[in-house]
UniProtKB/Swiss-Prot annotation:
Limits of the S5 DRBM domain: 16-79
Family: Belongs to the universal ribosomal protein uS5 family.
Keyword line: Ribonucleoprotein, Ribosomal protein, RNA-binding, rRNA-binding
Family annotation (Pfam families): Ribosomal_S5, Ribosomal_S5_C
Keyword Ribosomal protein: yes
Subunit structure, as described in the record: Part of the 30S ribosomal subunit. Contacts proteins S4 and S8.
Name by which UniProt lists this protein: Small ribosomal subunit protein uS5
GO biological process, one term: translation
Domain writeup: The N-terminal domain interacts with the head of the 30S subunit; the C-terminal domain interacts with the body and contacts protein S4. The interaction surface between S4 and S5 is involved in control of translational fidelity.
Gene Ontology molecular function, alphabetical: rRNA binding; structural constituent of ribosome
Function, in words: With S4 and S12 plays an important role in translational accuracy.
Gene Ontology CC terms: small ribosomal subunit
The species this protein was found in: Chloroherpeton thalassium (strain ATCC 35110 / GB-78)
Taxonomic classification: Bacteria, Pseudomonadati, Chlorobiota, Chlorobiia, Chlorobiales
InterPro entries: Ribosomal_Su5_D2-typ_SF, Ribosomal_uS5, Ribosomal_uS5_bac-type, Ribosomal_uS5_C, Ribosomal_uS5_N, Ribosomal_uS5_N_CS, Ribsml_uS5_D2-typ_fold_subgr
Name of the gene this protein is made from: rpsE
Amino acid sequence: MLTNPRKKIRPGELNLKEKLVHINRTAKVVKGGKRFGFNAIVVVGDGEGHVGYGLGKANEVQDAIAKGIEDAKKNVIEVPIIKGTIPHQIFAKFGAAKVLMKPATPGTGLIAGGAVRAVLEMAGVKDVLTKSLGSSNPHNVVKATVHGLQEVSDAYDVSERRGKSLQDIYEG
């Protein structure tokens, strides 16, 4: 039987790229006027099945982005990608954000917008159909997408759950 491909991920061993999804400016009203702060949501990935997201908050934009990248590297997950797409359809929710992802044939491309596209690009998914429903808040859409990708199960996971070998799963 095969060994479990999903093992503990060490971000230092991966060649991670970063992608900034959204920057938000916040204001706190104080006696002397307004004090501005920033938060940034960042997605990191190696384009080969590893992706993570992070939120950074600071008084300066660059500091918020740096904190977001640091946080994202702590939350990297592994996603099974088969022939450039996901193994099966996924529907995920986080808050009011809902994301539907469907596998697609090679050559279809990455049909996704905004935050969903950023996450799937960083994960290395080449062909997928997506639809974002409900809230379009980038924070919740990113979280819904990543939670959906965490729920993806490949043939190995299915065989382990059913207590059968991979050969039995493929032969029916």
